[in-house]
């Protein structure tokens, strides 16, 4: 009898726990994805803060030349970063217990791998949690689909690119100047500016900013006034009201006359789908571009592609970009390579008689 009562209480406790986890009445929804999201993001955030403040220099290139990234080792907010895991580790899974000591783990950049892997798991679970909450509220799933774009972008630079290049040391550093360094080296080695998927990403991000500004300003300029001239127009709005808060017909008429009629949406659903889909598709393409360049399927190479009738090269902007790429490649990891990879791959020219 005692065993049966204990079993019932245990089952009842588990049932109450499940109800609490999946309840949409909580101030912050947890969900089953949240059970994994909360510890992984807390771990990533905690280690990031500690390492950004106090981590010792990391031997990123595996050549016994540590690079300082933390505040206590001479950096400021702009120059500081979590330095990627050493090239000596490559793609090996490198938890603390795999190192001979904590000092060795820090020297080889163990915190970077810990932060990145927990962060990627956490943001993927955040996306799943968005879907889970939408499902429980009877909403459609497109919020999670939109969030998949930044998740794909983060996965591309922190996981896919290191896998393609063979080492976590090629991942993006977790800091401002480190991000710029990553961008410059990426351009030097992969010519990303000449990759069509990057161009689509630029169109997505800048276009999304433009459309967001246009939409916000049009809506704000066509609010239906429910107040006097002496009161704020915002005071006429009640949260959850059934009436429209702005006049879409007026906004459509304004924009249609500003450009032309069919440049303006007259359907609010189509408009908001477009506002979501444009930047999301652009960022998807950029993430796909990074993932293909990870395996060295690089941007277009139009170097010395224009020649005159005598076969002499007529330089184009593509040739100027190529010269800049070579210069950037010469500068980066200056002590790790005896010669830039692109130049080292060229056969030597015989100058003998």
Swiss-Prot record:
The membrane topology term of the UniProt record is: Multi-pass membrane protein
Q: Which GO terms describe its biological process?
A: photosynthetic electron transport in photosystem II; response to herbicide
What positions belong to the pro-peptide in this record?
345-353
Reaction(s) this enzyme catalyzes, per UniProt = 2 a plastoquinone + 4 hnu + 2 H2O = 2 a plastoquinol + O2
The site annotation (Cleavage) covers 344-345
Residues annotated for [CaMn4O5] cluster binding in this entry: 170, 189, 332-333, 342, 344
Enzyme Commission number(s) from the entry: 1.10.3.9
Q: Which residues bind Fe cation?
A: 215, 272
Q: Which residues are recorded as binding chlorophyll a PD1?
A: 198
Q: Does the keyword Transcription apply?
A: no
Bilayer-crossing residues are 29-46, 118-133, 142-156, 197-218, 274-288
Localization, per the record, is: Plastid, Chloroplast thylakoid membrane
Annotated site location: Tyrosine radical intermediate: 161
Report the PTM annotation: Tyr-161 forms a radical intermediate that is referred to as redox-active TyrZ, YZ or Y-Z. C-terminally processed by CTPA; processing is essential to allow assembly of the oxygen-evolving complex and thus photosynthetic growth.
How is this protein annotated for GO cellular component?
chloroplast thylakoid membrane; photosystem II
Point out residues bearing the modification Phosphothreonine: 2
Q: Where is this site: Stabilizes free radical intermediate?
A: 190
Read off the Gene3D superfamilies from this record: Photosystem II protein D1-like
> What keywords appear on the UniProt entry?
Acetylation, Calcium, Chlorophyll, Chloroplast, Chromophore, Electron transport, Herbicide resistance, Iron, Magnesium, Manganese, Membrane, Metal-binding, Oxidoreductase, Phosphoprotein, Photosynthesis, Photosystem II, Plastid, Thylakoid, Transmembrane, Transmembrane helix, Transport
InterPro entries named in the record: D1/D2 (IPR055266), Photo_II_D1/D2_sf (IPR036854), Photo_RC_L/M (IPR000484), Photo_RC_L/M_CS (IPR055265), PSII_D1 (IPR005867)
Subunit composition and interactions: PSII is composed of 1 copy each of membrane proteins PsbA, PsbB, PsbC, PsbD, PsbE, PsbF, PsbH, PsbI, PsbJ, PsbK, PsbL, PsbM, PsbT, PsbX, PsbY, PsbZ, Psb30/Ycf12, at least 3 peripheral proteins of the oxygen-evolving complex and a large number of cofactors. It forms dimeric complexes.
Family membership, please give it. Belongs to the reaction center PufL/M/PsbA/D family.
The cross-references to NCBIfam families, in alphabetical order and at most eight, read: psbA
The extra comment attached to this record reads:
2 of the reaction center chlorophylls (ChlD1 and ChlD2) are entirely coordinated by water.
Q: What's this protein's function? A: Photosystem II (PSII) is a light-driven water:plastoquinone oxidoreductase that uses light energy to abstract electrons from H(2)O, generating O(2) and a proton gradient subsequently used for ATP formation. It consists of a core antenna complex that captures photons, and an electron transfer chain that converts photonic excitation into a charge separation. The D1/D2 (PsbA/PsbD) reaction center heterodimer binds P680, the primary electron donor of PSII as well as several subsequent electron acceptors.
The protein here is known as Photosystem II protein D1
Underlying gene: psbA-A
């Amino acid at each position: 009898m005692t065993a049966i009562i204990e079993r019932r209480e245990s089952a009842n406790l588990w049932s109450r726990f499940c109800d609490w986890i999946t309840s949409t009445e909580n101030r912050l929804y947890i969900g089953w994805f949240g059970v994994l999201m909360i510890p992984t993001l807390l771990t990533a955030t905690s280690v990031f803060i500690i390492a950004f403040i106090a981590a010792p220099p990391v031997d990123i290139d595996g050549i016994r030349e540590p690079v300082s990234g933390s505040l206590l080792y001479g950096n400021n907010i702009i120059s500081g970063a979590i330095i990627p895991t050493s090239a000596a580790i490559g793609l090996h899974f490198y938890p603390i217990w795999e190192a001979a000591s904590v000092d060795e783990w820090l020297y080889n950049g163990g915190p970077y791998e810990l932060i990145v892997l927990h962060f990627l798991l956490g943001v993927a679970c955040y996306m799943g949690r968005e879907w889970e909450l939408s499902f429980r509220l009877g909403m459609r799933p497109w919020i999670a689909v939109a969030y998949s774009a930044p998740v794909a972008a983060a996965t591309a630079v922190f996981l896919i690119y290191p896998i393609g290049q063979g080492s976590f040391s090629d991942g993006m550093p977790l800091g401002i100047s480190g991000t710029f360094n990553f961008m410059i080296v990426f351009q030097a080695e992969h010519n990303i500016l000449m990759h069509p998927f990057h161009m689509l990403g630029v169109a997505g991000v800048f276009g999304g900013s433009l459309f967001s500004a246009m939409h916000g300003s049009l809506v704000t300029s066509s609010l239906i006034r429910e107040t006097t001239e002496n009161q704020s127009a915002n005071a006429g709005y009640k949260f959850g009201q059934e009436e429209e808060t702005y006049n879409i017909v007026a906004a459509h008429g304004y924009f249609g006359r500003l450009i032309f009629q069919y440049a303006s949406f007259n359907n609010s659903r189509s408009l908001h789908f477009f506002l979501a889909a444009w930047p999301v598709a652009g960022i998807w393409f950029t993430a796909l571009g990074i993932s293909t360049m990870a395996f060295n399927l690089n941007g277009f190479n139009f170097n010395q592609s224009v020649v005159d009738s005598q076969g002499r090269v007529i330089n184009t902007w593509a040739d100027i970009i190529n010269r800049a790429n070579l210069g950037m490649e010469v500068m980066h990891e200056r002590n790790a390579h005896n010669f830039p990879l692109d130049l080292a791959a060229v056969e030597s020219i015989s100058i003998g008689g």
